[in-house]
């Protein structure tokens, strides 16, 4: 029962509940370089589908994780890439998050080099998962796709994002 020999009910978190959650879809595409070869990152647009708890807010390509919580963020997507590297077929992309860009780049890099396949165009699965701790202040996330080593066109990026407030 609720009281008695089994004791009082526990705090939030028991039986798999959480403080709040957010589910959305993601989309973007575009050239990741300028004519002179300089990088041109492309922001990932976020569309809220459902949420509970009010701990996550979005605006265009920005996601705000409200302070006072620890969040689990998972992105699952598909992306189509095309090389523009002078008939070599090489391409490379990576994602940034506006929070820890160095880690994010290393964790998400997709690269094709060494094989000479002119005009290559490939579909890749993309996944990213990490914990963000917003103990003292809100965390503004801005996910962007950028080229890494080679001129690359992002023909499409479509996926989902799930955010869970763990406490």
Where are these regions (language model features)?
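Low-complexity/repetitive intrinsically disordered segments
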Residues: 1-6
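Extracellular jelly-roll beta-sandwich "head" domains, especially the C-terminal globular C1q domain
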Residues: 10-13, 17-167
